[in-house]
Amino acid sequence: MLLWAVMLRCVEPIATIAAALSFKDPFVCPLHKQHAADAAKRRLAAASLSDHCAVYNAVKGWEAAVRSGGGAGDRYVHDNFLSRATLQMLQSMRRQFIDILCSAGFLPPSPAGGAPGAIMLGGSAANENSSQEDVVKAVVAAGLYPNVIAVRKHGGRPSSRPPRLSVRGIGRVELHPKSALAGMTALLQPYMVYHTLVRSSACFVHDATCVPMMALVLFGGKLVAQQAGAGGAVTLTLDGWLTVHVAADSAACVMALTQRMQHCLQAKFTTPALDVYAPSPPVSARVAQSNLPHRYGDSGFAAISRETLQLLRCSFSLARAAAAVTHGSATTEDAGSCSDDDSRATTAHLQPVQGFVTRTFQIGGGGGGSDAMDALNE
């Protein structure tokens, strides 16, 4: 998770979330104040639909309150039902994670001096996308995969009931009441990722983050592309169970980007002195006219970060638009397979990405499915 954060430039929030996953979250729930504590956590989660983002928002808000002085830090802890000792531990663990990344050459040395909090941990370049929740949540998905929850909404009309949730190999699960997402009826994304699942009277997920299909495709497991039929359509299959249908050019773009991510990480491991934040050269005219993914070798971390952000933004906006129009569509009953309705809904969400990614990744071609498939199979 931390290495993806370095690549996608959101080091401070991911280091904070990683610390909480390694230790515990800072929220407390006093007796007879459960409702107030739950409301405070939902307030910190805001519109992120993420328990993990709520943790980062809590730590960031507390640090800002402490810097303002006048006892604001103590008031913040009290008003938001937080543990000061846990917040301090998360601070310390996060600092250790950053120091390890610096020692390994993945981050530049920490700047000396300066007021505490004046510079985000890891430096400004390493946190260029730290305010982009779409990117932060995608990195959380990368770290927590394959802990994936499928979200199934009730019919085609808005419902007052929370959607049904299922995990592959386990079946139906429920969000624990302590989750900021518990009881929500409008989860815009068809999938969530989680860290802790506990079996008691039912299977309860204690912490979850809503993520789009594209985040799982980009940061999940093994991705296989297969020709889906006439017209250049391609089926992308993730780890043999999660499928999505896209246009051939879109599939070529996704496969190219995932390959470049792996190549850049391998290059960094091989050459620790490599500057991962050096500006990327412009894509050459030769590459811009080619569908071959492996010819993207002249684009480094900076281009990958920029292009991933654009693709994730598009994926999130498409899901939001679809939710606004349809008020929800069915997803998988069992996370191990996709129904016909699910496939059509997913295709409808992602087909508009074809033109977007063709422009964003500068892949030429006018819908030649066979050429794109040849590129994917190389």
Question: What residue spans do the PLM features occupy?
Answer:
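A positional "C-terminalness" feature that preferentially activates on distal terminal regions of long
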Residues: 244-378
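Second RecA-like catalytic domain
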Residues: 1-255, 259, 263
